[in-house]
Amino acid sequence: MAKAVVFFAEGTEECEALLVVDLLRRAKVEVLVASASGSREILSSHKVHITADALAEEVDYSDVDLVVLPGGIPGTPNLAANKTVTDTCVSFVKTGKKVAAICAAPSVLAALGLLEGKNATAHAAFQDKLAGAHVLDTEVVVDGNITTSYGLGGAIPFALELVRQLAGETEADRIRSAIAYRH
Protein backbone atom coordinates (compact mmCIF):
# COMPACT_ATOMS: atom_id res chain seq x y z
CA MET A 1 0.00 0.00 0.00
CA ALA A 2 1.28 3.46 -0.89
CA LYS A 3 1.93 5.89 1.93
CA ALA A 4 1.76 9.70 2.03
CA VAL A 5 2.44 12.37 4.62
CA VAL A 6 0.57 15.66 4.43
CA PHE A 7 2.26 18.39 6.45
CA PHE A 8 0.02 20.78 8.38
CA ALA A 9 1.21 23.92 10.18
CA GLU A 10 -0.47 26.77 12.00
CA GLY A 11 -2.21 28.73 9.24
CA THR A 12 -2.37 25.93 6.66
CA GLU A 13 -5.10 26.34 4.02
CA GLU A 14 -7.39 23.62 5.34
CA CYS A 15 -9.33 22.95 2.13
CA GLU A 16 -6.16 22.27 0.13
CA ALA A 17 -4.75 20.04 2.86
CA LEU A 18 -7.87 18.10 3.80
CA LEU A 19 -8.95 17.54 0.19
CA VAL A 20 -5.64 15.78 -0.47
CA VAL A 21 -6.04 13.69 2.70
CA ASP A 22 -9.63 12.80 1.77
CA LEU A 23 -9.05 11.77 -1.85
CA LEU A 24 -5.89 9.80 -1.07
CA ARG A 25 -7.70 7.93 1.70
CA ARG A 26 -10.60 7.17 -0.67
CA ALA A 27 -7.95 5.57 -2.89
CA LYS A 28 -6.80 3.42 0.06
CA VAL A 29 -3.49 5.25 0.32
CA GLU A 30 -2.22 5.31 3.89
CA VAL A 31 -2.13 9.01 4.82
CA LEU A 32 -0.50 10.50 7.87
CA VAL A 33 -1.30 14.08 8.90
CA ALA A 34 1.95 15.45 10.35
CA SER A 35 2.12 18.69 12.30
CA ALA A 36 5.01 21.02 11.60
CA SER A 37 4.00 23.31 14.45
CA GLY A 38 5.31 21.49 17.52
CA SER A 39 1.83 20.46 18.66
CA ARG A 40 -0.68 17.96 17.31
CA GLU A 41 -3.36 20.65 17.66
CA ILE A 42 -3.33 23.00 14.67
CA LEU A 43 -5.41 26.09 13.88
CA SER A 44 -5.81 26.46 10.12
CA SER A 45 -5.82 29.69 8.12
CA HIS A 46 -9.60 29.97 8.49
CA LYS A 47 -9.68 29.02 12.17
CA VAL A 48 -10.56 25.33 11.79
CA HIS A 49 -9.14 23.17 14.58
CA ILE A 50 -7.31 20.11 13.25
CA THR A 51 -5.63 17.32 15.19
CA ALA A 52 -2.60 15.78 13.50
CA ASP A 53 -1.72 12.10 13.70
CA ALA A 54 1.86 12.90 14.71
CA LEU A 55 4.47 15.62 14.83
CA ALA A 56 6.58 15.86 11.67
CA GLU A 57 9.66 15.11 13.77
CA GLU A 58 8.18 11.79 14.98
CA VAL A 59 7.49 10.30 11.54
CA ASP A 60 9.62 7.54 10.01
CA TYR A 61 9.84 8.64 6.37
CA SER A 62 11.66 5.52 5.14
CA ASP A 63 8.48 3.89 3.80
CA VAL A 64 6.71 7.09 2.72
CA ASP A 65 6.17 7.52 -1.03
CA LEU A 66 4.95 11.13 -1.09
CA VAL A 67 5.05 14.25 1.06
CA VAL A 68 2.59 17.09 0.46
CA LEU A 69 2.91 20.76 1.38
CA PRO A 70 -0.42 22.63 1.39
CA GLY A 71 -0.48 26.39 1.03
CA GLY A 72 -2.00 29.05 3.20
CA ILE A 73 -0.69 32.03 5.09
CA PRO A 74 0.94 31.83 7.57
CA GLY A 75 0.99 28.07 6.96
CA THR A 76 3.52 28.22 4.13
CA PRO A 77 6.16 30.22 6.02
CA ASN A 78 5.54 27.98 9.03
CA LEU A 79 6.26 24.90 6.90
CA ALA A 80 9.39 26.60 5.54
CA ALA A 81 10.59 27.22 9.10
CA ASN A 82 10.38 23.54 10.06
CA LYS A 83 13.71 21.75 9.52
CA THR A 84 12.11 18.31 9.34
CA VAL A 85 9.80 19.48 6.54
CA THR A 86 12.58 21.11 4.54
CA ASP A 87 15.11 18.31 5.09
CA THR A 88 12.51 15.71 4.10
CA CYS A 89 11.64 17.58 0.90
CA VAL A 90 15.31 17.82 -0.07
CA SER A 91 15.92 14.15 0.71
CA PHE A 92 12.83 13.02 -1.20
CA VAL A 93 13.67 15.01 -4.33
CA LYS A 94 17.30 13.84 -4.29
CA THR A 95 16.30 10.17 -3.91
CA GLY A 96 13.50 10.25 -6.51
CA LYS A 97 10.61 10.12 -4.05
CA LYS A 98 7.54 12.25 -4.72
CA VAL A 99 7.00 15.78 -3.36
CA ALA A 100 3.89 17.85 -4.00
CA ALA A 101 3.07 21.46 -3.13
CA ILE A 102 0.06 23.68 -3.77
CA CYS A 103 -0.75 27.41 -3.69
CA ALA A 104 2.04 29.31 -1.89
CA ALA A 105 3.90 26.15 -0.85
CA PRO A 106 5.85 25.65 -4.11
CA SER A 107 7.80 28.72 -2.96
CA VAL A 108 9.21 26.54 -0.15
CA LEU A 109 10.54 24.07 -2.73
CA ALA A 110 12.00 26.93 -4.79
CA ALA A 111 13.75 28.42 -1.76
CA LEU A 112 15.40 25.02 -1.24
CA GLY A 113 16.62 25.01 -4.86
CA LEU A 114 14.39 22.06 -5.72
CA LEU A 115 12.61 23.74 -8.64
CA GLU A 116 15.78 24.77 -10.49
CA GLY A 117 15.20 24.02 -14.18
CA LYS A 118 11.81 22.42 -13.46
CA ASN A 119 8.35 23.29 -14.73
CA ALA A 120 6.16 24.40 -11.83
CA THR A 121 3.21 26.53 -10.84
CA ALA A 122 1.99 28.34 -7.73
CA HIS A 123 -0.62 30.88 -6.70
CA ALA A 124 -0.25 34.01 -8.85
CA ALA A 125 0.92 36.00 -5.82
CA PHE A 126 3.82 33.54 -5.35
CA GLN A 127 4.87 32.78 -8.92
CA ASP A 128 7.65 35.37 -8.68
CA LYS A 129 9.06 33.35 -5.75
CA LEU A 130 9.68 30.27 -7.92
CA ALA A 131 13.34 31.10 -8.53
CA GLY A 132 14.93 28.91 -11.17
CA ALA A 133 11.66 27.33 -12.29
CA HIS A 134 9.92 27.60 -15.63
CA VAL A 135 6.57 28.91 -14.35
CA LEU A 136 3.41 27.64 -16.04
CA ASP A 137 0.04 29.22 -15.32
CA THR A 138 -1.99 26.02 -15.18
CA GLU A 139 -3.83 24.00 -12.52
CA VAL A 140 -1.34 21.19 -12.03
CA VAL A 141 2.23 20.71 -13.21
CA VAL A 142 4.14 17.44 -12.93
CA ASP A 143 7.87 17.53 -13.61
CA GLY A 144 9.63 14.32 -12.66
CA ASN A 145 8.92 13.57 -9.01
CA ILE A 146 7.61 17.08 -8.18
CA THR A 147 3.94 18.04 -8.54
CA THR A 148 2.73 21.62 -8.06
CA SER A 149 -0.64 23.34 -8.25
CA TYR A 150 -1.73 26.97 -8.28
CA GLY A 151 -4.15 26.97 -5.37
CA LEU A 152 -7.49 26.04 -3.95
CA GLY A 153 -9.15 26.28 -7.37
CA GLY A 154 -6.85 23.51 -8.56
CA ALA A 155 -7.08 21.39 -5.41
CA ILE A 156 -9.32 18.68 -6.88
CA PRO A 157 -7.20 18.10 -10.00
CA PHE A 158 -4.09 18.29 -7.78
CA ALA A 159 -5.41 15.64 -5.39
CA LEU A 160 -6.61 13.45 -8.27
CA GLU A 161 -3.15 13.65 -9.85
CA LEU A 162 -1.64 12.46 -6.56
CA VAL A 163 -4.16 9.60 -6.49
CA ARG A 164 -3.14 8.72 -10.07
CA GLN A 165 0.53 8.70 -9.08
CA LEU A 166 0.06 6.51 -6.00
CA ALA A 167 -2.95 4.33 -6.86
CA GLY A 168 -3.19 4.40 -10.66
CA GLU A 169 -5.33 5.90 -13.40
CA THR A 170 -8.26 3.52 -12.83
CA GLU A 171 -8.50 4.52 -9.17
CA ALA A 172 -8.24 8.22 -10.03
CA ASP A 173 -11.06 7.80 -12.56
CA ARG A 174 -13.17 5.93 -10.01
CA ILE A 175 -12.77 8.69 -7.45
CA ARG A 176 -13.34 11.41 -10.06
CA SER A 177 -16.67 9.75 -10.84
CA ALA A 178 -17.56 9.12 -7.18
CA ILE A 179 -17.13 12.79 -6.27
CA ALA A 180 -18.93 13.89 -9.46
CA TYR A 181 -15.94 15.89 -10.68
CA ARG A 182 -16.59 16.44 -14.38
CA HIS A 183 -13.72 18.63 -15.52
PLM region spans:
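Active-site-adjacent pocket-lining segments in enzyme domains
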Residues: 3-12, 26-35, 53-183
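A cross-family phosphate/adenosyl-ligand binding-site feature
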Residues: 41-53
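Short acidic-hydrophobic surface loop/beta-edge motif
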Residues: 40-44, 139-142
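Short glycine/proline-centered loop/turn elements that form peptide/ligand docking sites
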Residues: 18, 35-38
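Rossmann-fold NAD(P)-dependent oxidoreductase module
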Residues: 23
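Short N-terminal binding/cap micro-motifs at the start of the first secondary-structure element
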Residues: 12-17, 41
